[in-house]
């Protein structure tokens, strides 16, 4: 088992990337905020299928958190993250601090309109500006040929795809299927916040999504499936439901009212269980 090279500056990372590319090797990047779990490791393994060298980045990005959100409480543990990356043979861990990413006087924000505006964009207005900015920087800094993101953050994946296309960033973006626990709950760093009772109740989230997706696939009205999913979550003990919506899969435009027809849809959900906000999504139709 070989530990990944750990670097903290863009200059150090680029030295390694230059050497790899001079040797004719492709480079993949897997951006994360740390607190790595099997879902993240599955992204690294997928990246290894598309490139000879893989960089995992760990940076809890302050620009995507609003003042009232969980930036300070977000789980961190670089040593544990490095050990997990060693198990899957990741080549390099880029772990910058905030000053390395945002030097004094930093004044630029990457704004992606359209696909970023509904759902998470409406619930967390600051979020996607921070995401698009840091991901654009990571693409430029790493000069990666390939980037791998999980479909668990589906809207984020679509925002990043739009941003890279619009800015002509020459990186192939690959979406990886959501990694799930045996009971169907999507793996997430925030699952660590759940009590044992909440963790047992959380399975209602994928269950409600599956039921809604099945109802729509059988020709049921989209709006009825959405309402039924909200009711199922509330009955299971979820408090505030930020959204349950079935949207067009690529641009997240609204579908309905009525049946889905020939459209390719995606159900996207965000809801609170105690003090923990869980998100998930699933293909529909």
From Swiss-Prot:
GO molecular function: ATP binding; pantoate-beta-alanine ligase activity
Organism annotation: Caulobacter vibrioides (strain ATCC 19089 / CIP 103742 / CB 15)
Lineage: Bacteria, Pseudomonadati, Pseudomonadota, Alphaproteobacteria, Caulobacterales
Name assigned to this protein: Pantothenate synthetase
Pathways involved: Cofactor biosynthesis; (R)-pantothenate biosynthesis; (R)-pantothenate from (R)-pantoate and beta-alanine: step 1/1
Binding of ATP, residues: 33-40, 150-153, 179, 187-190
NCBIfam families documented for this protein: cyt_tran_rel (TIGR00125), panC (TIGR00018)
Reaction catalyzed: (R)-pantoate + beta-alanine + ATP = (R)-pantothenate + AMP + diphosphate + H(+)
Organism domain of life: Bacteria
Function: Catalyzes the condensation of pantoate with beta-alanine in an ATP-dependent reaction via a pantoyl-adenylate intermediate.
Binding site for beta-alanine: 64
Something else known: The reaction proceeds by a bi uni uni bi ping pong mechanism.
Keywords: ATP-binding, Cytoplasm, Ligase, Nucleotide-binding, Pantothenate biosynthesis
Subunit architecture: Homodimer.
Family stated for the protein in its record: Belongs to the pantothenate synthetase family.
């Amino acid at each position: 088992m070989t530990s990944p090279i750990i670097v903290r500056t863009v200059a150090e990372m680029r030295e390694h990337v230059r050497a790899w590319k001079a040797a004719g090797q492709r480079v993949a990047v897997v951006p994360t905020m740390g607190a790595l779990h099997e879902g993240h490791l599955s992204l690294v393994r997928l990246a290894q299928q598309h490139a000879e060298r893989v960089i995992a980045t760990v940076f809890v990005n302050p620009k995507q958190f609003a003042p009232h959100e969980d930036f300070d409480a977000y789980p961190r543990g670089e040593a544990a993250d490095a050990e997990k990356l060693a198990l899957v043979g990741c080549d390099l861990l880029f772990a910058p601090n905030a000053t390395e990413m945002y030097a004094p006087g930093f004044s630029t924000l990457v704004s992606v309109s359209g696909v970023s505006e509904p759902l998470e964009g409406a619930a967390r207005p600051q979020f996607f500006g921070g995401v698009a900015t840091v991901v654009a920087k990571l693409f430029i800094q790493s000069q990666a040929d390939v980037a791998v993101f999980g479909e668990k953050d589906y809207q984020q994946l679509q925002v990043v795809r739009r941003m890279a296309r619009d800015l002509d960033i020459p990186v192939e973006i690959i979406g990886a299927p959501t990694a799930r626990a045996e009971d169907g709950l999507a793996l997430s760093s925030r699952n660590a916040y759940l009590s044992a009772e909440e963790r047992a109740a959380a399975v209602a989230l994928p269950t409600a999504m599956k039921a809604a997706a099945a109802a729509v696939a059988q020709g049921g009205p989209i709006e009825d499936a959405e309402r039924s999913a909200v009711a199922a979550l509330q009955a299971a003990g979820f408090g505030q439901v930020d959204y349950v919506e079935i949207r067009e899969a690529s641009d997240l435009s609204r579908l309905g009212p009525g049946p889905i027809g020939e459209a390719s849809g995606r159900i996207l959900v965000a809801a609170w269980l105690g003090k923990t906000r869980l998100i998930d999504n699933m293909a529909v139709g």
